[in-house]
Amino acid sequence: MTKPIEKNMLRSRAIKLPEVTESMWEQVDEEHRNLVQEFLDAHSFRDKTRKQYYSSLRQFFWWVHTSLNGKKLYKISKRDFIRYQSFLKNRGMSSSGIALKKAGVSSLNNYIENVVAEDDHNYEKFRNFTRGLPAIPKTTTYEKVKVTYDDYKLMMDALKEDENYLGMAWLATAFNVGGRRAELIQLKTEILDYPVPEGQSYVMSHKVFGKGKGEGKPLEYMINTEALEYLRLWHEKRGYDHEYLFTTQYGGEPKQMSESWADYFCSDVLSDILGRRINPHLFKASCITYLLEVKKVKIELISKYVAHHEDVSTTIKHYDLRDFEEEKNQIFV
């Protein structure tokens, strides 16, 4: 009998909003549809951001069509948008999901306020109605349970037994380097030729692009010798050369790995090994927490060189999963 996976859920996941089909979209006010297309065409968004904005704007304007009787965008008020946020919240959407939907509308509004308003008298007095609203109450669907070093070794041992060299390379890099899934797949094979400087236990990667406007924020990651060891093993075993380290074969042709591979690998392989829910986003926090908790590295250094944050408070708020058990045990001694 298969061992059940511990989900670590704090609340039920929201049911996805129904897709806004093409026939539904055709019913939306033509001006709104044109504004969405103009906005997307005017910006050099990353593919992922573009898809998110396109989806969220279709959802918003379908709601405007059905719930606000197709009210023109320039007539929509802050109160109307609060109603939209309530609509999303009442369907169980998490605070991060609502924030993502809000971001798409806010970005469109900024474009209209700064560009469209100059040429369209209807928008002369238009203001971004998503600004200055009450903060969205934070909700958490899954408890973040850190991947410990023991968890990491257990997974690596299981992958070694399976001769899953790609999995070992990805896991060793994710746990030791702390990059996001979209950043890891940008690592190039040339890294394996970089010499490790004397007195160091890492090499600096070439530039990869992280989250941010346009192509994204340029980042360089510290690739330690343990990650390099398993990257070399994978390179040796895969049997072909390629510009990128993380590759998979599609129709017999090797191609750069997609972001979704990490989702599958974590949910269908690593989760079964540990018996609890594992997702790619855990590894950045787990890497940072391991360096803080076990290696005792100063958080200022980790924040700057591993997390790539300008403010240490961002690292503490989102990625420090320490439980401080040793300190707590001193309280009632």
From Swiss-Prot:
The keyword rRNA processing does not apply. It comes from the Bacteria. Residues 142-332 form the Tyr recombinase domain. InterPro entries: CB, DNA_brk_join_enz, Integrase-like_cat_sf, Integrase_catalytic, Integrase_recombinase_N, Tyrosine_recombinase_XerCD. The active site is at R180, K211, H281, H308, Y319. GO terms for biological process: chromosome segregation; DNA recombination. Belongs to the 'phage' integrase family. This is SPbeta prophage-derived recombinase-like protein YomM. It comes from Bacillus subtilis (strain 168).
